[in-house]
Structure formats: C-alpha cells, structure tokens
Amino acid sequence: MSVPVSAQVSTPVSGSFQPAPNPSIAQTQAPRVAGRGHVLVIGNEKGGSGKSTTALHIAVSLMSDGAKVATLDLDARQGTLTRYLENRAAYIKRKGVDLPMPMHTPVPISTLNERSAAEADERARLEAALEPAVGAADFVIVDTPGSDTHLSRLAHTWADSLLTPLND
C-alpha cells in the first residue's frame, strides 16, 4: 500500500534563518536582567585550547553588532587577551582607523601568602572589576587561565553562560 507523503517546502527569506529545534538538546538561556550585562566565562583548565582567541573574536563580533562589551583577563601569568587588545589599540592608533574597543580590565592574582587572605583579596579584585562591568556593558567576556585557580573558580560563579573551547 502506498502512503502519500506531503511536504511543505518554503523558500527561506534572506536574513531570516532560524535553526530547526532539536529536541535532543536541552537549550537554556540565562534570564536577562535589565541593566545588567550578560557574563560569558570562557574556561578550560587546558592551556592552548583557544580561550583568549575565542574571547577576542566574540568581543569583536558583539561590538561589530553594536553591543557594549567589557573584557576581563584573569590569566595574569600569560595575559594573552590583554596583549591582543594592546596590539589592537596600537594598530588603531598607528593606522588611524575607527575600530571598536571593549572596556578591558586585567585582574591579577593575589600576592598575599596566607591562603584565606589571598582568596579574600582575589574575591575583592574580581568583584571590583566585574560589578562596574556588568553595569556598563551589554556583555562581559571573562578569559580564564589554562589552570585551576581560585580566581577562575570565582569567575565561574558569576557566569550567565560558560563556553569551553576544545583543541586536540
């Protein structure tokens, strides 16, 4: 017995692409709080996975779309995101071009020796950087180090979204 199959084919309208819902993937979105920037933490304990590069590309893309972006660099040892942004600022100045720049804050680890004092110091440093950023920007991109640090774990508690780049 033959069963007729009917399919409705529609021509997509330019600029209206919407991905098909995938019921096998639980899709959640952190609720937007008016006047508070969305905090995206980019983390992976592995070094060289592309965290800083991903942070820069996401920030530039969001700024190109008109969003106000803040970036925080928690990798005091390497400071790759900070160096990327310093190079971008130097290029803008040298070439006289108008490119968007995020509000950027490097957040160094504590230099205190006593563990509980160092952890309290790092919490204060992170909050001092994050609180004004979430109030001033639409998005706050947090680049974490390629290691397990107290500062990195604290940043994860602030995340509205987590992104973990993988690189074999």
Regions found by a protein language model. Give the residues of each.
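Extreme N-terminal, non-catalytic leader segments
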Residues: 1-45
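P-loop/Walker-type NTP enzyme "switch/lid" segment
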Residues: 34, 39, 43-49, 63-139, ...
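Hydrophobic positions on the alpha1 helix immediately C-terminal to the Walker A/P-loop
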Residues: 53-54
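Active-site signature of alpha/beta-hydrolase-fold catalytic machinery across serine-
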Residues: 57, 61
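Conserved catalytic-core segment of NTP-binding enzymes
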Residues: 65, 70, 142-168
